[in-house]
Swiss-Prot record:
Lineage: Bacteria, Pseudomonadati, Pseudomonadota, Gammaproteobacteria, Enterobacterales
Active site positions: H106 (proton acceptor)
Cofactor details (free text): Binds 1 heme b (iron(II)-protoporphyrin IX) group per dimer.
Gene Ontology cellular-component terms listed: cytosol
Entry function: Bifunctional enzyme with both catalase and broad-spectrum peroxidase activity.
Protein name according to UniProt: Catalase-peroxidase
Quaternary structure (record): Homodimer or homotetramer.
Gene3D superfamilies attached to this UniProt entry: 1.10.520.10, Peroxidase, domain 2
Cross-linked residues, Tryptophyl-tyrosyl-methioninium (Tyr-Met) (with W-105): Y226-M252
Covalent S-S links between cysteines: none
Pfam hit, one: peroxidase
InterPro entries from the UniProt entry: Catalase_peroxidase, Haem_peroxidase, Haem_peroxidase_sf, Peroxidases_AS, Peroxidases_heam-ligand_BS
NCBIfam families registered for this protein in UniProt: cat_per_HPI, PRK15061.1
Binding sites annotated in the UniProt record for heme b: H267
Length: 726
């Protein structure tokens, strides 16, 4: 019978057709827009982590709550937990030391220096996909073990901080002296949607190490934190893994010494678990049934826990004292001959064939086994450069301890940004170059000083476009992921930023502002750069008939060149900045997607992005001085002309060539070219969400609102890195 017949039959019997069948009628079910249009612009990325998802409310102050924490008592509770073995997940050798170190490592290890995303800073290991990654098997148990402590201390300690602190306490409990701990990681309440984990659709899909340099990916296989411990694509070859190891650790900003220290230090304690084949392992937490209550990977092998546990499928114990810190990793690495073998689960690993049975069994004191290692552990012996470092650590355990302490601190704090964000009693005093250190303030400009400086800037001969452009160039390097970049430090005046193509305006404007700073000696160059933007915007608003005072918070400082890691700051150079109509490469995504990416890094909402682009276009802030997107006959006036003319049906847009990157807007009647535009301009008329926002500012009653909204969004960007104001 046809569908029509079925419907007719239902109606004729008086039954409601909408109450029949098993279709999912819940909210959000059914075919979504992205199913129809998979290339749909991800404007939604700008609306994540809003107050609507935060149960703590807008007034919650984590730094204030943390100050109430009994930090010593918390660490005491964590220490006690380490040896409080639970029957539902028994501790190896009666200690959770290795488990908690792995939890902290895998939380922090998703960080990628290329785009600043990932890392432990927001407690993302609680959410998909990380909570169910193949490399994170059994870390659901670690987080569940921590729950009674989190429940006890409540909002005085975030999950994000607790994960890392638990790893630190585990190291300390093993007899290791850590470098310190900085709290300040604030939880979010939903998964990060902006992190690009890769295009692969299957877990453990292999990537060539060279590809990692071209994309913001942290691992050589989908679903891993770093590299495949069995070698690239399960090759079992230690030497071939060297390139993959360097690529992944290098993407976190680690050099060879830090890489060796982290691998060896992380594998000095604990074990891997591979009691039987992976076919015994059930669904991950996201796919597990509701009664599992967020736990996954239930095993049908034996008891499923303890000696029967299956995690990675590898069954490796590296050292003779797996719950106490030692130098046995390097001693065993070089002392014995290693033969490739397989774990009970069938995974490739190595065994010390000429070693006695010196490794204690985790659950039976009467049993011992030979030392075992991962394929990638042996890379530290057989790669020539790694081998040199490893032998030095073998012969100088104190050098190894110092290197691991510093590398572990860097690993677990790399995405926290400047040290001004750190809180707690164990923050190290030493400034580290990867923290982008800043000097102490030299100036405290008064309100009178600021008024005089603004007058001097206004009289300097700089145009509105130049003043606004230089301020944006200074502040817009900020990345919300790892809190790097921004205007504080005036690193626009230093290498490498001063020489970036996108910052061409700096060559013209900075000499003027630097001379003014030296002459007045009342404020830092960083403050004067931002103040120039204030002057430019106030002039542009006044020209539009709106009198407005742009808020300005002095107190920025000027970094020195020796406080600036040129290689690491080079990663902040944009491949595109749609706010300035800049694009360096055409082989990476679309121009409009890169605009969204930039706005998301700047923590902007969709309305904030919209108003900033519209305002900057009419102020003529394109990086190269082009007229693309400058839809106005009165540049330098903070008007709504960009929106009004973009949405004006008098103009018809067509690409100028096959690249579809540059467009001409012609008068439909005369055929005359009126405007030119890029994709970063036209997207505000083509994308339905952005067009809806553009229409707000194109209305006749929107002018004053536009100016106020522009100023608010502008000030937000200028202050993104003002952690000294927290």
């Amino acid at each position: 019978m046809s569908t029509t017949d079925d419907t007719h039959n239902t109606l004729s019997t008086g039954k409601c057709p909408f109450h029949q069948g098993g279709h999912d009628r819940s909210a959000g079910a059914g075919t979504a827009s992205r199913d129809w249009w998979p290339n749909q612009l991800r404007v939604d990325l700008l609306n994540q982590h809003s107050n609507r998802s935060n149960p703590l409310g807008e007034d919650f102050d984590y730094r204030k709550e943390f100050s109430k924490l009994d930090y010593s008592a918390l660490k005491g509770d964590l220490k006690a937990l380490l040896t409080d073995s639970q029957p539902w997940w028994p501790a190896d050798w009666g200690s959770y030391v290795g488990l908690f170190i792995r939890m902290a490592w895998h939380g922090a290890g998703t960080y990628r220096s290329i785009d600043g995303r990932g890392g432990a800073g927001r407690g993302q290991q609680r959410f998909a996909p990380l909570n169910s990654w193949p490399d994170n098997v059994s870390l659901d148990k670690a987080r569940r073990l921590l729950w009674p402590i989190k429940q006890k201390y409540g909002q005085k300690i975030s999950w994000a901080d607790l994960f890392i602190l638990a790893g630190n306490v585990a190291l300390e409990n093993s007899g290791f002296r850590t470098f310190g701990f900085g709290a300040g990681r604030e939880d979010v309440w939903e998964p990060d949607l902006d992190v690009n984990w890769g295009d692969e659709k299957a877990w453990l899909t292999h990537r060539h190490p060279e590809a990692l340099a071209k994309a913001p990916l942290g691992a050589t296989e989908m679903g891993l934190i770093y590299v495949n411990p069995e070698g690239p694509d399960h090759s079992g070859e230690p030497l071939s893994a060297a390139a993959a190891i360097r690529a992944t650790f290098g993407n976190m900003g680690m050099n060879d010494e830090e890489t060796v220290a982290l691998i060896a230090g992380g594998h000095t304690l604990g074990k891997t678990h591979g009691a039987a084949a992976a076919s015994h392992v059930g669904a991950d937490p996201e796919a597990a049934p509701i009664e599992a209550q967020g736990l996954g990977w239930a095993s049908s092998y034996g008891s499923g826990v303890g000696a029967d546990a299956i995690t990675s499928g590898l069954e490796v114990v590296w050292t003779q004292t797996p719950t106490q810190w030692s130098n046995y990793f390097f001693e065993n690495l070089f002392k014995y001959e290693w033969v490739q073998t397989r774990s009970p689960a069938g995974a490739i690993q190595f065994e010390a064939v000429d070693a006695p049975d010196i490794i204690p069994d985790p659950f039976d004191p009467s049993k011992k086994r030979k030392p075992t290692m991962l394929v990638t552990d042996l890379t530290l012996r057989f790669d020539p450069e790694f081998e040199k470092i490893s032998r030095r650590f073998l012969n100088d355990p104190q050098a190894f301890n110092e290197a691991f302490a510093r590398a572990w601190f860097k690993l677990t704090h790399r995405d926290m940004g400047p040290k001004a964000r750190y809180i707690g009693p164990e923050v190290p005093k030493e400034d580290l170059i990867w923290q982008d250190p800043l000097p102490q303030p030299l100036y405290q400009p008064t309100q009178e000083d600021i008024i005089n400086l603004k007058a001097a800037i206004a009289a300097s001969g700089l145009s509105i476009s130049e003043m606004v452009s230089v301020a944006w160039a200074s502040a817009s390097t900020f990345r919300g992921g790892d809190k790097r970049g921004g205007a504080n430090g005036a690193r626009l005046a230093l290498a490498p930023q001063r020489d970036w193509e996108v910052n061409a305006v700096a060559a013209r404007v900075l000499p003027v502002l630097e001379a003014l700073q030296k002459t007045t000696n009342k404020a830092s160059l960083a403050d004067i750069i931002v103040l120039a933007g204030v002057v430019g915007i106030e002039q542009a608003a006044a020209a539009a008939g709106v009198s407005i005072s742009v808020p300005f918070a002095p107190g920025r400082v000027d970094a020195r060149q020796d406080q600036t890691d040129i290689e690491m700051f080079s990663l902040l150079e944009p491949i595109a900045d749609g706010f300035r109509n800049y694009r360096a490469r055409l082989d990476v995504s679309t121009t409009e997607s890169l605009l969204i990416d930039k706005a998301q890094q700047l923590t902007l909402t969709a309305p904030e992005m919209t108003v900033l682009v519209g305002g900057m276009r009419v102020l003529g802030t394109n990086f190269d001085g082009s007229q693309n997107g400058v839809f106005t006959d009165r540049p330098g006036v903070l008007s709504t002309d960009f929106f009004a003319n973009l949405l004006d049906m008098r103009y018809e847009w067509k690409p100028t060539d096959e690249s579809n990157e540059l467009f001409e807007g012609r008068d439909r009647l005369t055929g005359e070219v009126k405007y030119t535009a890029t994709r970063a301009d036209l997207v505000f008329g083509s994308n339905s969400v952005l067009r809806a926002l553009a229409e707000v500012y194109a209305c006749s009653d929107a002018h004053e609102k536009f100016v106020k909204d522009f100023v608010a969004a502008w000030v937000k960007v200028m202050n993104l890195d003002r952690f000294d104001l927290l």
